[in-house]
Amino acid sequence: MALTSFLKQNKLHDVFEKSLAKQDKYFDLVWSARRPAIDAPVEDWTFYAYGTKTPTKVKEISEDSQILLARKAVQKIVEKYPEDYANLLGEDGRFHHGFNSGALAAFRYVLDIIETGC
């Protein structure tokens, strides 16, 4: 009985670890899809940061500016998941974004069940 319980607990831990890794992956992809493309023009990133392409008061772009930090974060995601990110920019990008969003929700659901037991 103890061995069976140990194996189940070990298996559950493996499922938890793998689900956590998948959740992180799909979170990154969904997050990056909600930002301008990495190669988007500066105007798109300005609009993302300020809500307009021609802000009246532009914050100084420094090493810690929102635009620069977001672009660096997207670049890391591009490097980590190049094929998945390319799918988001492709002809079927909306499909892939929807898939990634659904996968993120599913892995969050699995993790919630494991953590709460419900």
Language model regions located:
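Generic N-terminal initiation segments characterized by hydrophobic and/or small/turn-forming residues
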Residues: 4, 9, 66, 85, ...
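Acidic, low-complexity, intrinsically disordered interaction modules
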Residues: 55-101
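Amphipathic alpha-helical binding modules
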Residues: 91-118
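Short, charge/polar-rich alpha-helical segments
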Residues: 2-71
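Generic structural signal for well-ordered, non-membrane alpha-helices
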Residues: 21-28, 83, 105, 109
